[in-house]
C-alpha cells in the first residue's frame, strides 16, 4: 500500500498533460542547486536537444533522503548537488549508478569525478584565503597550515564545522597530512578565531572587509558576488579584499578545490536523456555560463573564465581525487569536534 501511494504521489508531482506521452523525450532532475543556477541551462538544453525536463529543487540532504525512500519508484533520472562529499554520500547510499561515458571521461579530469564513474564534477569552486588588504601583508601568508600560527591569533573568520565546505577542506588535509597533524592544525586554527563561527561565507567576507577579522577562508565565488553586486555597500566591501592562493610552492599540493556535480540515479528510466544532459553540461558553452553567472571555475580545461575570476589570478589546484572527500568526511567531522571547532 505504501508503494502504491508513493507511486501516485510521484506521478502527481511530475505528470503534465504531455509528460505521459511515450513519444516524448524527457529527463527528470532532482537538483540541490538553486533554480537560477540550473534552469537557464535546462531551457537551452531543451531548445538545442529537443529533450524536455522536469525539475525538482531542494536541500541536498532532503533530496538524497527522498531518493532513498522512493527507491525503485523514484522518477528521478539525474541527481545534482554541490560538494564531492555529498556526491560520494549519494553513491554510498546506493542511489546512483556507474556510467561508462567516453565524453564525460574525456572532458572531466579524473580528479574531479568518481573513480568508479558514479558521479561527475560539473563546476569547480576554490576554498582559499581572502584577506583585508589594509591590515594584512600578503607576504606573511603561505599555506593553509600557516593559518594555525599563533601570529594570527584573533584574526581568522571561518564558518562552523557544520559547513560541508569546511568538512571537505579538513578531509583533504587528512589525506595529505594524516589525522594527528590535521587535528593539531585544527586546534591551532580554533585558537586563532576572531569570533565564534557564525553565518555563511558572505558574512565572513563582510566581517573581514569591515576589519572584524583580517583573514577568512571562503569560496571565491562569494567574493565574485560581492564584486558584481547591485548593492553599493557590498561592492565597496569587496574593494577592501584580495585573494591569496595557498600551498603554491613547488612540491606543495595547491589550493583545495571542490565541485558541484551530478550522477545518473540507480533507477533512471531515461538514461539516454540523462547522459545527453550531463554531456551538455560539460560543453564549453555551459561551462563558460557557470563561470560568468556564478563565478565558478570550469571543470573542462580550456573553457573561458569570467573577468572576475581572471582578476583573482592563476593558481595550482590540489590534484587528489575528490572521492576521498566523502571517504574521509566522518573522520573529519569527529576531528573538528575534538578540536573544539563548533
Task: Report residues per predicted region.
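Periplasmic solute-binding protein
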Residues: 87-95, 113-142, 170-171, 257-263
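Short beta-strand->loop
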Residues: 30-33, 96-105, 115, 119-120, 131-133, 139, 145, 232-256, ...
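Ligand-binding pocket segment of bilobal, Venus flytrap-like solute-binding proteins
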Residues: 161, 168, 172, 177-246
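Extracellular/periplasmic bilobal clamshell ligand-binding domains
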Residues: 306-342
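Mature extracytoplasmic/periplasmic domains
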Residues: 260-319
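A structural signal for short loop-to-beta-strand junctions that line the ligand-binding cleft
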Residues: 74-79, 97-129, 145, 156-158
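Early extracytoplasmic/lumenal segment of secretory-pathway proteins
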Residues: 23-88, 342
